[in-house]
Amino acid sequence: MNNEEIFKGNGIGEFRVNIAEIVETGITGARILPDNTDHILAVSGLSAEVTIHVVNEGEEEDNLSFTAWKGGISKKEFKRLRNMGTDIFSLKFLNESCNFFFTTRSNDWRIMMRETELYPLCFIYPGHELKITELLTGQSLTVPGTAGNFYALNLEAVRLKFFTDYGVLANLFDVYSGDTFALRIGIEQSPTVRERYRLRFLNSYGTYEVFSLEGEASVTPGMDEDEDAVFRRYDEITDDYYSDRIRTEIQEAVTIKTGFKRPQEIRFLLDLLSSDDVYLSGYGREEIKVIPSAEEFSYRVRPDAPQNVTLKLTFADKESNWTGEITESGYRKPKVHSKEFSKQFN
């Protein structure tokens, strides 16, 4: 796998080998830095080249080669596509006349997101040159790449290009592969709120996306009642025992409302809740890995109104030492031009 031998085994007779967990070790994943100024970013680590070499008892040999991707689709859709004689790659990812991006935000020809949810969209470069047309001015931007390679479209850099060249804050784009229309991308203004948080998560297709939260957050420190944490210690002065304990670990949990979300965003939220890799930003200076859940969450089969959902984000790490955030300038008196300063001139 990736020119390296990972697994070697043998067996007798007819047998099956599930190689999914073995192959997954060769897919490292990659975090894309959205502050890059390139329009598209080359992405690696999200797939692996796999070769299986088989030799039977009769010394007959055969090779099977394929590209493995981390992620998948629902069992229901997998069965349906199999009965149709197709797969998600032929139907979507390698189809230049449709929404070919690795996003679960949308299941049609349009992708809508808020400004606070902008994050590079991953895709396999189509057979023809990619072109992005801004609908207000009609101006186009050509984004060259190599067909079949994996890239991420940097929407922030694309918007900056149109703003710099044409003086327009672009919010609506049409994406073409050559002369073939593929999809439309719309960017909405985020509501003005007192508190805002973001969740970056690994979606079902194996790429990262961002979900914006516009509700007020509250923190609940969770303490484990461990009987072994309390013990008896001997006091030489009184010749008696007294109770003592080791430092107690506390696991924080943040409760927050999502803000009102449309039906399509609620489906997107379901993918977030099932993700195995979720990070919270906006709570501190750095992202924090969390485990999301939703209590008493239900939605209508045919929804006709936005919905506000309460999420519980449990921190992945437990802490027994509480020192606050440590910053380089946090222990010095702030100057006039610091991010935080008093009205008194210093």
Feature annotation, model-predicted:
Residues 2-6, 180-346:
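Extracellular/virion structural assembly segments
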Residues 1-192:
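Preference for solvent-exposed, low-hydrophobicity sequence contexts
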